[in-house]
Every structure is written in C-alpha cells, then in structure tokens.
Amino acid sequence: MRLLGLLIAACVTISSTARAEDIVWSKVDDAMGRSAAVTQDVHRYGFPRTDLSVTLDGVTIKPSLALGGWVAFKPMGSQAMVMGDLVLLETEINPVMAKLIEGGLDITAIHNHLLRASPATFYMHVGGHGDPAKMAAVIHDALRSARLR
C-alpha cells in the first residue's frame, strides 16, 4: 500500500511539473517588442543605445563597444530567471528603476563604465524570477517610460 502511495505521488508530481518547453517564447518576444537571439535555452534581447552620441575625451563611442544594453531569460521549470544590464542616462535612472521595482524586478547595481564620457551613461543591472512574459512586459514598460525601445 505504501509503495502504491509513493507511485501515485510520483505520477502526480511528474504530470503537474511544467517544463521549459511549456514557456511560449513568442509571448515573451511580443512583450519585449522584438525577437530574441537564442543560444541553447537562453533568450537574449539587445538594447543598443544607437540614439545616443557619447564621446570620451573627444572620441565617439560606438554603441557596440560600450552602449549595448541587454536582458536575457533562462527557463527554470515553468518560469524563468531574467538578468540584464541596461544603459541609461542619469535622467532615465529613476523612472526606469521605479517601473522595474513596481513590477517586482530587482535592481542589483547602478554604476558607470565610462568616466569622463559626455553625456554620462550609467549601467543598471536587473534581475528577477517568475513568468517570463510578465517580466518582459515590465521591462518593456520601464524602458518605454524613458522613451527607450
């Protein structure tokens, strides 16, 4: 009888456990407003700051060199973990941070890579765990609040 109980419990656990394949990545793409670059099971979205003209000691910085923001999702069961690094101007930090925190995401760092750059750019590290489409919508909304796409 005990063996039968364990077998039933194992079957219920296996049948109710959602897998990474259950995540509908097209919904995440739609929420992000772009398609991901996919490597194995990691879905990465780039946000290069091509709208900025940043100089450092008279040298123009190319977005691909130091102005490439991104977020990446990795499936964890039926949910996902998200991590990223967003490139922001000083005036964009508070509105983006407020939206991300309001949406349940974590800000793990804000720092500067390019001292003496003009305009000053800052790098906001974000992270979270949960429904990937919901987290993507929060990130997209936060970036839109700073007029970033």
Predicted regions mapped to residue ranges:
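Long, contiguous binding/interaction regions
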Residues: 20-121, 125-149
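Bacterial N-terminal signal peptides
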Residues: 5-15
